[in-house]
Amino acid sequence: MPAIVLIGAQWGDEGKGKATDLLGGRLQWVVRYQGGNNAGHTVVLPNGDKFALHLIPSGILTPGVTNVIGNGVVVDPGVLLTELAGLDERGVDTSRLLLSADAHLIMPYHVAIDKVTERFLGAKKIGTTGRGIGPCYQDKLARVGVRVQDVLDEKILTQKVEAALEFKNQVLVKIYNRKALDPQQVVDEVLEQADGFKHRIADTRLQLNEALERGETVLLEGSQGTLLDVDHGTYPYVTSSNPTSGGAAVGSGIGPTKITTVLGILKAYTTRVGSGPFPTELFDQNGEYLAKTGGEVGVTTGRARRTGWFDAVIARYATRVNGITDYFLTKLDVLSSLDTIPICVGYDVDGVRYDEMPMSQTDVHHAKPIYEEMPGWWEDISHARTFEELPKNAQNYVLRLEELSGAYISCIGVGPGRDETIVRRDVVR
């Protein structure tokens, strides 16, 4: 059976949790392959229960599914334990969660440096969540990071923390005028936290590949979105990892030839949290309508999301860089009760038309959207379960997005619930 990659095709917050939850009953494994607790998935169960997950894969809510925090993820031990406790309190079985021995740990000094750096930059800040994600990935690439497996050997953990703080404390004290961190205190804190997750540490790359060899289905769940990818996103206003489909193989240990489907998640309009270019951003009553009707508040940050019309330029770009085979279009219901719905089909940059993503980020900043208008609809579509049950104008809107994006729209979300979905084509194949 296949490995399926699920990836956001915009700037994150597209509704990936809903897609994972919908597929959950057909899956045996769900894997987070990058990022950390700087992203959030919201899942609404058929009984109305709502779960906001930041680190643990969405498959944890589906009985019988084994969930993996992969080697490409950076893990805050405290956040992991808090999230597990919250799920346990609500009766969710968390026994089938595994943690890659090679995932990196977010240490207290990563969080401290992240927060003071953003304050130091002031108006020039990137807009990070301040959770230590970037500094942890920096240490990973500099080969001075602390990995999950290090908590199994106190001597190695102590050596790594002491070596790291020789430099980090200089930065905190001499540049940012903050107090130095005590190495032993950091070690003791991490070891105490490790008591709550040591039993979950595993060679997950081996287990995942063996699962595929047995014919089981594995979903590789990305966080954030394509335009936040450190290589392919709107740099420097990006995350510190690779949410794109190429990152799925690296962050899980599954070879790329074992991935048969790349499911992109597209919101029927566009949103973004934090700083950075956003060509279709709205500052009028339409933007307010999308934000209010769509409930556009960041799951992790609590920050209001910026809103705009659908951008086909970035959708085509996402299709290309991810090799997307299918799309799940979410929040189509939010667009009900609009007379007309603009779609951005290209950019105008200083009088030059771009139908594809400009190479220069300066051009992306200066891009003005070129719109094509589609007639809207006023009907309530939340009860539609087949494509034909949608109003004709809603059908035409979906088909136009499909044409512009360059991949088949296999699923359509018409409400927040798991069952409020239209399936046009099975993505597990």
Swiss-Prot record:
Its cofactor is Mg(2+). IMP binds at D13, E14, G15, K16, N38, A39, G40, H41, T129, R143, Q224, T239, R303. It catalyses: IMP + L-aspartate + GTP = N(6)-(1,2-dicarboxyethyl)-AMP + GDP + phosphate + 2 H(+). SMART domains: Adenylsucc_synt. It is found in: Cytoplasm. Its main location: cytoplasm. GTP binds at residues 12-18, 40-42, 305, 331-333, 413-415. GO terms for cellular component: cytoplasm. GO terms for molecular function: adenylosuccinate synthase activity; GTP binding; magnesium ion binding. InterPro entries: Adenylosuccin_syn_GTP-bd, Adenylosuccin_syn_Lys_AS, Adenylosuccinate_synth_dom1, Adenylosuccinate_synth_dom2, Adenylosuccinate_synth_dom3, Adenylosuccinate_synthetase, P-loop_NTPase. Mg(2+) binds at D13, G40. The keyword Metal-binding applies. Binds 1 Mg(2+) ion per subunit. Pathway: Purine metabolism; AMP biosynthesis via de novo pathway; AMP from IMP: step 1/2. NCBIfam families: PRK01117.1, purA. Belongs to the adenylosuccinate synthetase family. Plays an important role in the de novo pathway of purine nucleotide biosynthesis. Catalyzes the first committed step in the biosynthesis of AMP from IMP. This is Adenylosuccinate synthetase.
